[in-house]
UniProtKB/Swiss-Prot annotation:
Top-level enzyme category: transferase
InterPro entries on file: Kinase-like_dom_sf, MAP_kinase, Prot_kinase_dom, Protein_kinase_ATP_BS, Ser/Thr_kinase_AS
PTM comment, free text: Autophosphorylated. Phosphorylated on serine and threonine residues.
Active-site residues from the entry: 125 (proton acceptor)
Phylogenetic lineage: Eukaryota, Metazoa, Chordata, Craniata, Vertebrata
Quaternary state and interactors: Interacts with RP1. Interacts with AR and CDK20. Found in a complex containing MAK, AR and NCOA3. Interacts with FZR1 (via WD repeats).
Protein name: Serine/threonine-protein kinase MAK
Expression sites (tissue/organ): Expressed mainly in testicular cells at and after meiosis.
Compartments reported by the entry: Nucleus; Cytoplasm; Cytoplasm, Cytoskeleton, Microtubule organizing center, Centrosome; Cytoplasm, Cytoskeleton, Spindle
Length: 622
């Protein structure tokens, strides 16, 4: 290790930490992965999956393992250095990618994946963080810590890949999955490249399946019988959902892109295309030169000369806490000052002007050599700098597109993303100021974003926009499917609204009282349970409820509750019977009459000379 100088830490994961280093001989920048566990022999080292897989893989779109060093029982992997990962590349942009850029990124990902599968491995952890970039022009697959050989014998472990990119057969605990799980993950990544939002942002494994069903619809038993067997074995039933056209969720994607994503995101792994088959899809047959360009293949030499890393600063990752197995995962981010969200600016999708793709020809695609031009010693003049974290991943529910329109008007939409998955203290204090413990939020107030985890941007999706079309969008769809609405107590909803439908504007209507009525005002009560629970009543009028200090319990018979009189006798107070009683059959209930019979006791027996007259009380002779 004395041949390398470590400069700063790039990341820290479950199995090891990643450092940025420089070769003392050539000055070349490298990424050094230091394993946490100790290795006492070379045989132990060579049995690692990462070593076994990477030493066999040499491809322009697969990260290069330069050497393995064992020193003082510590193991070090020396990798080529890459500027950033795909997640950081998306996060740091304020404009969506044009489709030509997405096509080139997807082509490189599928090229690398096809090479991995061809050599008998599948990755098992495909996600944007494990796709390393030198800008959008060069993408490489990294982190083979979970890779398996295709010929290895199942059962495999059930926990693989990050949840948002996990295939349904893995979510249903299949033990015989294979390379199609990588194709599913690539389909999810492709959708995210168009929108900068995860397509299936589940908060748990079960919620992940719900999110998939909400987009793809409930699978039919005839379409995926193995899936129903897996579901029944773990006592799971698929939720009944109607599929959404991906064009609604990804309006800036061409029809060929939608078709390719639909094929890769098939419930049945046997029906998904392989990576090689996906490369032959018409989506890639547009006459565009795909693959890394020559000067980006040599961009690392530019970094060696121009990139002077700053002093180490603590990175501020604002994403969900996850293991960081990525070997080159995250350049050290520098703390960013709080700033307002910048709306995403859409780039006109190129498919509107591009010529229709020519018919599929066998000879057209068999030009892999042209896709990987020779290395030319040209050095770009633009310096490369590391960019810190600016915000968390953007979510569904913030963008409303006009159906049938292009992305030109995306600049008018509210595309700001929350900078944290946790609620900010400012937002929480603001909510406390605007809400009192005795009332619902006012109709015009925004609902505070204190939901946990993935629902952090739901309140932004609830804002009405009269200028935009009410076409079925991801915002409206997820809102309809939500099991609860923020700021609304479901118990009070069932109490007041009865069987009425609660929609996204529930807190704007008159179902929810804005303030309590005055003490001692006319109180209307209805019988909430005519058959039993004689003492249970619920507030029915608009005047609110009665505080507990105005109530008093009398006796144990029937467990009645009476209102304490406010300056008048009990005879002046009666229960008002309004329309709420009309819906119950049987005789009417007069609580005054019945309760008075219960409360009235026999007159006390007069005492004799100040003592109780037991004979008068119990009978007998004096």
């Amino acid at each position: 290790m004395n041949r390398y100088t470590t400069m700063r830490q790039l990341g820290d994961g479950t199995y090891g930490s990643v450092l940025m280093g420089k070769s003392n001989e050539s000055g070349e920048l490298v990424a050094i992965k230091r394993m946490k566990r100790k290795f006492y022999s070379w045989d132990e080292c060579m049995n690692l999956r990462e070593v076994k897989s990477l030493k066999k893989l040499n491809h322009a779109n697969v990260i290069k393992l330069k050497e393995v060093i064992r020193e003082n029982d510590h193991l070090y992997f020396i990798f080529e250095y890459m500027k950033e990962n795909l997640y950081q590349l998306m996060k740091d942009r304020n404009k969506l990618f044009p489709e030509s850029v997405i096509r080139n990124i997807m082509y490189q990902i599928l090229q690398g994946l096809a090479f991995i599968h061809k050599h008998g491995f599948f990755h098992r952890d495909m996600k944007p963080e494990n796709l390393l970039c030198m800008g959008p022009e060069l993408v490489k697959i990294a982190d083979f810590g979970l890779a398996r050989e295709l010929r290895s014998q199942p059962p495999y472990t059930d926990y693989v890949s990050t949840r948002w990119y996990r295939a349904p057969e893995v979510l249903l605990r299949s033990s015989v999955y294979s390379s199609p799980i990588d194709v599913w993950a690539v389909g999810s990544i492709m959708a995210e490249l168009y929108t900068f939002r995860p397509l299936f942002p589940g908060t748990s494994e079960v919620d992940e399946i719900f999110k998939i069903c909400q987009v793809l619809g409930t699978p039919k038993k005839s379409d995926w019988p193995e899936g129903y067997q897996l579901a029944s074995s773990m006592n799971f039933r698929f939720p009944q959902c109607i599929p959404i056209n991906l064009k609604t969720l990804i309006p800036n994607a061409s029809s060929e892109a939608i078709q390719l994503m639909t094929e890769m995101l098939n419930w049945d792994p046997k029906k998904r295309p392989t990576a090689s088959q996906a490369l032959k899809h018409p989506y890639f047959q547009v006459g565009q030169v795909l693959g890394p360009s020559a000067h980006h293949l040599d961009a690392k030499q530019t970094l060696h000369k121009q990139l002077q890393p700053p002093e180490p600063k603590p990175s501020s990752s604002e994403r969900d806490p996850k293991p960081l197995p990525n070997i080159l995962d995250q350049p050290a981010g520098q703390p960013q000052p709080k700033q307002g969200h910048q709306p995403l600016q859409a780039i006109q999708p190129p498919q509107n002007t591009v010529v229709q793709p020519p018919p599929k020809q066998q000879g057209h695609h068999k030009q892999p050599q042209t896709m990987f031009p020779s290395i030319v010693k040209t050095i770009p003049t633009n310096p490369v700098s590391t960019v810190g974290h600016k915000g968390a991943r953007r979510r569904w529910g913030q963008t409303v597109f006009k159906s049938g329109d292009s992305c030109d008007n995306i600049e008018d939409c509210d595309l700001g993303a929350s900078h944290s998955k946790k609620p900010s203290m400012d937002a929480f204090k603001e909510k406390k100021k605007k809400e009192s413990p005795f009332r619902f939020p006012e109709a015009g107030l925004p609902v505070s974003n204190h939901l946990k985890g993935e629902n952090r941007n739901l309140h932004a999706s609830l804002k009405s926009d009269t200028n935009l079309s009410t076409a079925s969008t991801a915002k409206q769809y997820y809102l309809k499917q939500s099991r609860y609405l923020p700021g609304v107590n479901p118990k009070n909803v069932s109490l007041v609204a009865g069987g009425k439908d609660i929609n996204s504007h529930s807190w704007n209507n008159q179902l929810f009282p804005k303030s309590l009525g005055s003490m001692g005002a006319d109180l209307a009560f209805k019988r909430s349970n005519a058959a039993g629970n004689l003492g249970s009543y619920s507030a029915y009028s608009q005047t609110g409820c009665v505080p507990s200090f105005l109530k008093k319990e009398v006796g144990s018979a029937g467990q009645r509750i009476h209102l304490a009189p406010l300056g008048a006798s009990a005879a002046d107070y009666t229960w008002s019977t309004k329309t709420g009683q009309g819906q119950f059959s049987g005789r009417t209930y007069n609580p005054t009459a019945k309760n008075l019979n219960i409360v009235n006791r026999t007159q006390p027996v007069p005492s004799v000379h100040g003592r109780t007259d037991w004979v008068a009380k119990y009978g007998g002779h004096r």
